[in-house]
Amino acid sequence: RQRQMCIRDSHSAVRAQGSSRVFIGKVSDESADSRGHGQWHGCGVSKPSMGTVVWNCNWGQDACFESHATQPRATLFDNCRGGLVRYHAGGADTEAPNHLSDLTLWNLEVTGTIDEKGINFASDFKWWDAGNVWWKIYPPIVVGTHGQAVTFSQEEGQLTYEESTGVKVTPESLYEAQLQNRLGYVPAWLKALK
């Protein structure tokens, strides 16, 4: 049974906070502010969360996946759709970095890169900005980023691995492919969410 929650304008969507091995799936941010945009932070992680899978979720075009500092790690954003706007991941400057190692973005469909001030983050996107206390993400694995065009900084230490930027890859879902490989099948509960 599917339930829908509509809120006008708020700060965060759904997140795993201080937890391990959490699955967040099929969440769609349909809230809207005066500009028609959703939450400040999309689905994601906060505090020392680890091993989180964020699967097939959508968030606003001027948002970002949530990575709310205090050292979350080992997070998979899998086949999600939404904005890729720096600083909208969240977290206080005293709690940086926003994310430690093993952040993987798999088949992220980027729908927007412009923040509320009109700053466009579509080119030379940096994950670790040495000149800014608010944006510190350890070099992620980024595969199959597509949708709105984005280029990532090629400076040393910005990416652990990058592949097929601008093109959706197969398998569509890394999480589903791993389950198929490990279990020999994709569980019925996950198929039902599709």
Identify what each model region corresponds to:
Residues 2-7:
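Short, small-residue-biased leader/transition segments that mark boundaries at the very start
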Residues 8-169:
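Glycine- and acidic/polar-rich repeat regions and solenoidal domains
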Residues 152, 156-194:
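Long, low-hydrophobicity, solvent-exposed regions enriched in small/turn-prone and acidic residues
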